[in-house]
């Protein structure tokens, strides 16, 4: 019997099956499940990994992990690193905002250079709820309470209806390897 995630994923991607995707892969459980689903469904995709140099050896190990997965699965892998702290200092932005600005600019550059149809991220239901709560605490207007859009003309987030627990369970049940980012358990960053 197919898992809920597989059914939802297949249904969402049915209309886009002939597209060429660039998947943002950190090495964490969400993005590794996403990459595995793309692979399982024989979709055309490449992987993009950002090393923000924020966790020293751990960041480098994530980069190597993603690179090795791509080699093992015969997938094109784009990888880059940023001096995130310096960028944030120079642009007077927080780490989360700076890292987001850096990665999305790079993803969009890759999309334009290589002709990808969509940039795909592994945002999930928990991210959607977190965004809604943060925006409501900040006092945003109605536009801020909408949350993360599933699809725009350039971005696609097919896991937005799936919870983090469901993704983690799917990874365990399907022997999908991933890396745990120690900063995820920290309260240092407001996303």
Question: Which residues are covered by each model-predicted region?
Answer:
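ATP-dependent adenylation/nucleotidyltransferase module used to activate substrates
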Residues: 1-135, 165-166, 173
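Catalytic subdomain that performs nucleotidyl-dependent activation
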Residues: 118-122, 127-191
């Amino acid at each position: 019997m197919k898992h809920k995630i597989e059914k939802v994923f297949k249904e969402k991607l049915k209309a886009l099956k002939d597209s060429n995707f660039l998947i943002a892969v950190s090495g964490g459980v969400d993005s590794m499940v996403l990459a595995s689903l793309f692979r399982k469904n024989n979709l055309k995709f490449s992987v993009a990994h950002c090393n923000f140099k924020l966790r020293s050896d751990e960041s480098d190990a994530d980069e190597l992990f993603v690179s090795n997965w791509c080699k093992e699965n015969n997938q094109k892998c784009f990888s880059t690193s940023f001096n995130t702290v310096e960028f944030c200092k120079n642009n007077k932005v927080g780490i989360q905002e700076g890292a987001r600005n850096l990665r999305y600019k790079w993803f969009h550059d890759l999309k334009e250079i290589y002709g990808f149809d969509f940039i795909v991220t592994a945002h999930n239901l928990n991210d959607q709820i977190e965004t809604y709560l943060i925006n409501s605490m900040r006092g945003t207007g109605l536009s801020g309470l909408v949350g993360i859009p599933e699809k725009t003309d350039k971005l696609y987030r097919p896991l937005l209806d799936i919870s983090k627990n469901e993704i983690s369970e799917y990874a365990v049940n399907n022997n999908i390897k991933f890396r745990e980012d120690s900063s995820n358990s920290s309260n240092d960053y407001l996303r």
